[in-house]
Amino acid sequence: MKIKGNKKGFTLVELLAVIVVLAIIMIIAIPAVVESMNNAKKGSFKIYAQRALGNAESTFQSEDLLGTLPTDKNDDNRKKIGDNCYCYTLAGIGLTSSGNFKGYVTVSLDDKREATYRVTLTDNSYSTKGSTYTDLNTSSNIADGSGGITSSCASATCSTSTPSTTEQAGN
């Protein structure tokens, strides 16, 4: 039997070398891709929390101007939870298609009737409790996990701490 001198194809060693190179690339690339995906999820959560604060601010200011602020402590979507303190669920501020998001926004008024907006929110991957606009810019205020947060204003309380001017203005 005569062997032809023009062989075509790859040897087993060449194929194994390619597989090893691809494995090394995957080992290096996968953690970076996973970290990028997690950062994107956290960024999306932060944007949704800011949207909730914005919607609550708009809803509260409209109701305040129209004289229709919540007076009922039994309405769970928008309720008065204390003197100069109000709570709005996500549904109460128009975020009805919220998917996995659960939470609420509290609005507290100081003696000058300047409002402070604080969001308590989870999507079961991340959570934040009582955060203002400024707090959301600090990654330490966004935790992993649900934090036991519900969609109900039943456990909502108003903070007595004095926020900075930017927090009061919602910037």
Please identify what each model-predicted range represents.
Residues 140-171:
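Short, low-complexity, Pro/Ser/Thr/Gly-rich segments in the mature regions of secreted, periplasmic
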Residues 1-5:
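N-terminal secretory signal peptides that target proteins for export/translocation
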Residues 7-34:
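N-terminal single-pass transmembrane signal-anchor helix
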Residues 30-45:
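Sec-dependent signal peptide cleavage junction
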Residues 41-66:
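Membrane-proximal N-terminal amphipathic helix
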Residues 64-132, 142-143, 158, 170:
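Extracellular/periplasmic head regions of type IV pilus-like filament subunits
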